[in-house]
Amino acid sequence: MHIRFADPGDAAACLAVYAQYIDTSITFETVLPSEAEFSGRIRSYGAVYPWLIAEEDGHVLAYAYAHRAQERAAYGWNAELSVYVRRDAAGRGLGTKLYTVLLALLQKQGVRTAYGVVTMPNDASSALHQKLGFRVLGTYRNTGYKNGRWLDVVWFEKPIGSFTGEPRPLIPIPQLPEAAAILAAANT
């Protein structure tokens, strides 16, 4: 298994993984995005934050990415994380591996807090976040409606940086000097 950064050309492979979830409550999207739209997401998010792929023999098994958690300027040092694993690759620790690399990259970029937003019930995602040191921040009750029922969403939080002093601007992932070394270490 090899971890690398995604590029817009990976949209079809990532979309194939995501398609397995579109009819579930794991995502609140109800219509599968087009390949062009997904490519745009990879390009847009990847301009600032990491979007990672776990692949084996050239096949995408899973992906994880981060994006800005809130719009207002003062929230700029937070990131929301997501991970999607191909169903036939579940149970291999891919989510843990991708999140671990994602968190290391985000910390070097200057992100101070990482968030996971999980529709309940989702035992696998809850276990992943707790295993990696996230704590439950709170529950948005009945915040989404999909597949004939109202759904709760739990927010997980993990501080990954210092909260002393004025923060420096985030380093966009393409400009992060440590990025190659972090990926190399993940692939040894």
Task: Set out the residue ranges of the language-model regions.
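Active-site acidic-Proline motif in GNAT/NAT acetyltransferases
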Residues: V83-D88, R92, A104, M120-P121
